[in-house]
Design a protein with these regions (language model features):
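Membrane-proximal helix-turn-helix segments that form the acceptor-binding/catalytic region
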Residues: 75-78, 97-100, 104-108, 122-124, ...
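N-terminal subdomain of nucleotide-sugar transferases
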Residues: 1-51, 153, 210-218
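Nucleotide-sugar-dependent
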Residues: 203, 254-261, 266-288, 295-305
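Nucleotide-activated donor-binding/catalytic signature segment of Leloir-type glycosyltransferases, i.e.
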Residues: 233-260, 264
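An aromatic- and histidine-rich active-site surface loop
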Residues: 13, 39-40, 70-74, 86-110, ...
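A charged, aromatic-enriched C-terminal amphipathic alpha-helix characteristic of glycosyltransferases
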Residues: 318-324, 332-366
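Carbohydrate-associated surface elements
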Residues: 160, 173-174
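Conserved donor-binding/catalytic core segment of Leloir-type glycosyltransferases
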Residues: 155, 185-203, 208-213, 223-224
Length: 369
């Protein structure tokens, strides 16, 4: 049997790696279909896939070129299905127009099974509240919602997304490696925080700096940064302005080196603008695997995990001072227990074993057995 993995962007390669590994282990012939354009770098790149579709380039997240590029990829991906003739299509969403085009393909080829795997909500997850009600954005959203019923299975990457698309089951992300042992090296007299990931337009820099300002009143504070992004220099300057030192590690890929940084830190920041609809972030999985508790503003799944599993603190505009006081005054025993809690959470929901089991249940629903 042939499974086609269809994905437009390079932002989901970790998930694609897990899917390829799973389907290959189940005896499927896997054919990967993607574009030649890096959404992350906004440039053409050498994609490692069986079918690479050339598409229009774009340089802004909100642009006509971006929409036209998505439409072009989706239509060409449907044509690629005619050549591949897959038994199963596992389609990563966004882009939203892929749902429409795969629905057209399924209407013509009744025997094919289709899985839609929603890993982001466009336009809901974009920090553009004042525009989301406009007609172009409604059409963009409807390209997904109107055709989801054509899927035999609809996955969402988190419980929060299910509330928006009104269907589906959760396929949480996983990290395809063993978590390293924790060796916390914390000080009673100093607080160290970590920011991991891209520093872009959806990060709530004012929230982070306001929190750090309050913490620095009571204790010396240090922020470790692992990552880059268009707003990085601005972020660093804002943090320095509130009296907090910054250690810029740039991009770190070595798990051992990353773990050593996490072991120095009391908390990791998982903070985005309130208009962004996200229930779980990849950075939070890295924090979980490393045993690093979080300062969190993400709604849905992560907020609930913080409350139910005691893995960190939920931050909002109204409780910045209160949360800073808690962090500054809490005992080392409380912090160490949170480190155990967050790694236990990871081992419960976010391992490859759990990821594969969820996929197996879906295949049973489709094919029986």
């Amino acid at each position: 049997m042939v499974v086609a993995l269809v994905y437009a962007f390079d932002t989901c390669l970790d998930r694609i790696h897990l899917l390829k590994k799973y389907y290959t282990s189940k005896g499927f012939d896997v054919v990967s279909v993607t574009s030649n354009f890096s959404h992350r770098k906004k440039a053409v790149y050498q994609a490692k896939a069986d079918v690479v579709i050339p598409v229009r380039e774009y340089h802004k997240n909100l642009s006509a070129d971006r929409i036209l590029s998505h439409i072009e990829f989706s239509k060409k991906a449907r044509k690629a299905m005619e050549d591949i003739q897959p038994d199963l299509i596992h389609c990563i969403i966004p882009c939203n127009t892929l749902v429409k085009e795969m629905a057209k393909y399924k209407k013509k080829h009744h025997n094919v099974k289709v899985m839609y795997d929603i890993i982001d909500l466009w336009p809901e997850s974009m920090p553009i509240d004042r525009y989301k009600g406009l007609l172009p954005f409604k059409i963009w959203k409807n390209n997904r919602d109107k055709y989801l019923s054509s899927g035999d299975v609809v996955f969402c990457e988190c419980e929060l997304f299910k509330k928006y698309v009104h269907c589906g089951s959760v396929l949480y992300w996983a990290i395809d490696r063993e978590c390293l042992p924790m060796n916390p090296d914390l000080s009673e007299d100093e607080l160290q925080f970590c920011y991991l990931g891209s520093i872009n337009n959806i990060i709530d820099i004012p929230m982070i700096t306001a929190f750090l300002r309050e913490c620095s009143i009571k204790k010396k504070c240090v922020l470790h940064i692992i990552g880059n992004g268009e707003n990085k220099e601005h972020f660093i300057q804002e943090v320095l302005c509130v009296g907090v030192n910054v250690v810029d590690h740039k991009e770190v890929y070595d798990p051992v080196q990353k773990q050593e940084i996490f072991d120095q830190c009391n908390y990791g920041f998982n903070v985005m603008k309130p208009s962004v609809v996200v229930g779980l972030t990849m950075k939070s999985l890295d924090y979980m695997c490393a045993g690093l508790p979080i300062i969190n503003t993400i709604q849905g799944d992560t907020k609930d995990f913080c409350e139910e599993w005691n893995i960190g603190l939920n931050l909002n505009k109204g409780n910045i001072k209160e949360m800073a006081n808690i962090v500054c005054l809490e005992s080392m025993d409380v912090q160490l227990q949170r480190r155990k809690n967050i790694q236990n959470l990871y081992n419960t929901y976010f391992t490859t074993k759990h990821f594969n089991a969820t996929l197996s249940e879906a295949l049973k629903r489709i094919y029986g057995g």
